[in-house]
């Protein structure tokens, strides 16, 4: 059976923890899109880890972790992450890398930085991980697949052609140093040697695993609102963040995905620019940021303070719908225990009209939140294992959110650890 774990919102919802938890029963875990531009934090018996490329299953001996063909693979980051966990006594994980995955080139990171500099105040808030230039090249058909590292003659010729194009931009648009073909070729030979032990046809491997009845978990990055088609365009990432793309980015048939666990945070947070209707500011935001997440709400990749807001039913319902949600995992609920009252965004007012539908970007930028306030529970809920043992106002908050988003909340996370999870039967 194939399951997917994806985000409903801007990312940072807590997917890493949910994937880590579900990985106990998984045979294979796959990263199917994105690159090192977003991180996920995992707390387990080995300690606290912020991963950017490795799937969350690397902490289990029984799992195989796969980097799928849809991933933007930064090979040095990938290797360094393996070392970062094995240096902390995590056993060497079993990892496979798709021979069709494409490589983040050194110049992709440079072009990302140069473009942000050029745009100045109009920048997209990039993590400067090379993601947009990488995907631009992929779809312009001038990217490099992992398998091309093993075709020395073809690689050198293609590299010369691509560098010629890149150097025109470097000279005339960015006014930066030009690329050296020989230097890049030597770097790619190093990449080849680094990645060689992991490379295989992962699609064929997964086809065999599905036929054998293996439990397979697709691990998504970011969330619906960062999807290039359905997100808050252009403040989006460059690869699809939807569960549907899991089939493409892993190389499996779409009908094999039987369960989609969409992760929603009990409040909202976002990194980078763009419309954020339920956003809060000042001391109110700072306190939620300080108390939030695991050690504060700061980007796992950039360390930037996350923008904070109340739970947004409009955005979350939309996010769950686009993901094809079968189950909602509701995370970081324990963070809200300090509040006397908890506002929830249940609608948007756009040009004097209230809507519960998520609008296109230019309308979203004019939207004002319609808030309903619920009573808080004013206590620490960490350590509770049964839904009925949660405070009444806490249960009412969960049930209010569930009723407004229209998708069943079957898991509630009330702490950062693997054991901090409550399963519940939904009335939906």
Question: How would you label these PLM feature ranges?
Answer:
Residues 1-428:
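Non-transmembrane, aqueous-exposed alpha-helical and coiled segments at domain scale
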């Amino acid at each position: 059976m194939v399951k997917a774990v994806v985000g409903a919102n801007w990312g940072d919802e807590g997917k890493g923890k949910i994937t880590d938890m579900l990985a106990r029963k998984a045979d294979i875990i796959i990263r199917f899109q994105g690159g090192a531009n977003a991180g996920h934090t995992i707390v387990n018996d080995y300690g606290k880890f912020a991963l950017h490329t490795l799937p969350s299953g690397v902490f289990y001996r029984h799992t195989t972790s796969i980097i799928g063909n849809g991933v933007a693979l930064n090979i040095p980051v990938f290797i360094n992450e393996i070392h970062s966990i094995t240096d902390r006594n995590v056993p060497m994980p079993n990892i496979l890398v798709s021979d069709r995955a494409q490589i983040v080139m050194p110049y992709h990171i440079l072009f990302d930085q140069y473009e942000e500099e050029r745009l100045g105040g109009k920048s997209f808030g990039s993590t400067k991980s090379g993601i947009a230039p990488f995907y631009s090249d992929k779809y312009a058909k001038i990217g490099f697949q992992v398998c091309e590292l093993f075709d020395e003659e073809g690689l050198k010729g293609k590299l010369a052609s691509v560098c010629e194009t890149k150097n025109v931009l470097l000279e005339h648009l960015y006014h930066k140093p030009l690329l050296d073909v020989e230097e890049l070729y030597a770097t790619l030979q190093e990449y080849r040697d680094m990645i060689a032990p992991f490379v295989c046809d992962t699609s064929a491997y997964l086809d065999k695993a599905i036929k054998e009845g293996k439990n397979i978990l697709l691990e998504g990055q970011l969330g619906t609102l960062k999807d290039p088609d359905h997100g808050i365009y252009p403040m989006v990432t460059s690869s699809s963040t939807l569960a549907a793309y899991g089939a493409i980015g892993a190389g499996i048939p779409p009908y094999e995905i039987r369960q989609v666990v969409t992760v929603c945070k009990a409040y909202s947070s976002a990194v980078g620019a763009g419309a954020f209707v339920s956003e809060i500011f000042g001391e109110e935001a700072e306190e939620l940021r300080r108390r939030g997440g695991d050690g504060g709400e700061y980007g796992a990749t950039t360390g930037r303070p996350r923008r904070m807001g109340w739970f947004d039913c409009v955005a979350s319902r939309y996010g769950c719908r686009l993901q094809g949600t079968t189950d909602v995992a509701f995370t970081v609920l324990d963070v809200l225990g300090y509040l006397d009252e908890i506002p929830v965004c249940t609608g948007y007012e756009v040009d004097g009209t209230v809507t519960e539908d998520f609008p296109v970007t230019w309308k979203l930028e004019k939207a004002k939140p319609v808030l309903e306030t619920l009573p808080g529970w004013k206590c620490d809920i960490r350590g509770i294992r049964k839904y009925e043992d949660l405070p009444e106002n806490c249960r009412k908050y969960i049930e209010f959110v569930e009723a407004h988003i229209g998708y069943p909340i079957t898991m509630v996370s009330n702490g950062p650890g693997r054991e901090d999870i409550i399963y519940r039967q939904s009335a939906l």
